[in-house]
Amino acid sequence: EYKVTQFCQNCLAASCQKVCPKGAISLVNGRSQIDPDKCIKCGKCAKACPYNAIIYMERPCAAACGMDAIEMDDSGKAVINQDKCVACGQCLVSCPFGAIVDKGQIFQVVRAIMEKEKVVAIVAPAFIGQFGKESTPEKFTTAMKMLGFDRVVEVAVGADMCTIEEAEDFLMKVPAEQDFMATSCCPAWHAMVEKLFPAQFENISMTLTPMVFTARLVKKEDPDCKVVFVGPCAAKKLEAIRADIRSDVDFVLTFEELQGMFEAKGVDFAAI
């Protein structure tokens, strides 16, 4: 919303009032005031004010959300409309107060490790560079085993499997059955198309994601193990709770959550 600040000088020109196409600005107690019921947020008043006394105020989370899923309840608090949300996590990283969080599964992972279950971490290739310059692939694997993981598998192997199958799918269907094919790897993108562009949903490849390919490969080798996906994106948590995926990926951790586990355990990559 646009708001008139205390810097309003009650100038004789009243430029803000003159340029407003809806007559939403009036003089109240020696200062211009915007009627929110009339304001259309065109911004003309802010541009016309010679004192820069009118500012645009927007919630960082709402500004970051490309789905317009951030709304306000009756008390003015921000709420997430789950019918619009695609779990992309942009609101989460944009909130300067840390007021938005994704559902964590650190407790469940630690409990599985403490109960001596075989826990396998499948890690997105983006782990390189996430934990400082001392974090080489070899040191990262050692650090994961220090946390109690039995094995570490790179999801790059699943990405290769995904690429091969998706390429075969593309050659078979485009352009014989459809004009184009969109990738299937990102669950947030998948959900966005389903909600905003349902007519194009059938053009998304039905190939499994690298995470699922890797998880199923691990489960095939050891059906009783617990698979933990570790990556940069919170949207993977949405993917992992899907009915057809739930048995493949037991838990999901973000790199941020994994960093918290490293710190709690006292893991120092420089000392490994």
Label each PLM-derived region with a short phrase.
Residues 7, 37, 124-126:
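Short strand-loop junctions, especially beta-strand C-caps/beta-turns
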Residues 4, 21-24, 137:
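Generic N-terminal leader segments that precede the first folded domain
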Residues 10, 14-19, 48, 94, ...:
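Transmembrane alpha-helical segments of multi-pass membrane transport proteins and ion-pumping complexes
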Residues 1-3, 9, 26:
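Flexible, acidic/Gly-rich N-terminal and inter-domain linker regions that tether
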Residues 13-36, 44-81, 86, 90-106:
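Iron-sulfur cluster-binding cysteine motifs and their immediate structural context
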Residues 1, 102-272:
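Iron-sulfur-associated redox domains of electron-transfer enzymes in respiratory
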